[in-house]
Amino acid sequence: MAVPIRELDCLDALIWFGTGEAASDKLCISQSSISRTARKVAKIFHLELIKGQGEWTLIGDQTCLNLERHLHQKMRLDCGDPLRLEAQFFYAKSYAQMIQNKHLLGTCNFLDIARPIELLRNHVVDVWIAGYPDLPSPDDPDLTSIYLTRHPLHLAVKRDHPLVQLGDSVTLDDVRQYPCIALKDGAFPETQRYLESLGLWNSQVPVRRFNQEGWMEHAAERPSVSLASVLSIGLYDDPLVFLPIDLGHTTGQTFVVRREHENHPRIQALLTSLKIGSLALAKEHAEVSVGFES
């Protein structure tokens, strides 16, 4: 290996978590040490570490760096170091408790699928808990997806929203009179395609990572409609309620991993643990079903 494991950890943490503060919190290392070490490693691979839009990124050809990351990933798996997991914000809390004591869990605030997929391809993270149906292609040569849970996606609003007053008579035509919170174009392509066909993807939130302040500030501009499931509706500071409308759209948690590591004993042990957690979620919530044989 060209660099020690803990030194590459510092660079990967900056790229993965986005900020020195978040990297410091996760690794329990001072921000100054992380920054100094990350720049040292970037220089070894002839890369430039820069900060743009509030997050750290690398400029240059990362081929050699990713080969080094590949070696470190194999060491991580074989030597028992904590695995690195990222999860879509809407589903992270469901599994966080069983993950955090054994593995390194990301900030779980990405509001797209492109960034987590890139982190998987570049060997920065080992597993991504993604949201169905926005997944890598089934024909993807590097990544494979294993279903955990499935459940309906709902429309949700604040308790004082005018649509709540319509009760069971509310319709999609009623909903279309209000902005429906959407993410940046292409962030969740399959979900976007379906909701656009219903006229329900029309008020973009200008944030790359989830934060309550930015999300709720956008939602407060006009009485808006959000998307939620039984597993995510409790994550917002302002209480939301479901509208009694069947969207006909299914979401759920999916375990995404590199094909080469799918059958590694540690990956299989983690998957088994998450399946047990999924069964508990299905037992707690009638809408949740599991995507595997129990």
Predicted segments, located by residue:
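Short beta-strand-centered segments that line the small-molecule binding cleft or hinge
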Residues: 115-157
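A late-sequence structural motif
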Residues: 245-286
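Short beta-strand->loop
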Residues: 142-153, 230, 237-252, 261-262
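Hydrophobic hinge/microswitch elements
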Residues: 186, 195-241
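Short helices/loops that flank or line small-molecule/ion binding pockets
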Residues: 26, 114-128, 212-223
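N-terminal hydrophobic or amphipathic helices and topogenic motifs
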Residues: 1-111, 277-294
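Flexible hinge/capping segments at coil-to-helix
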Residues: 148-153, 157-180
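Secondary-structure junction motif
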Residues: 94-96, 176-199
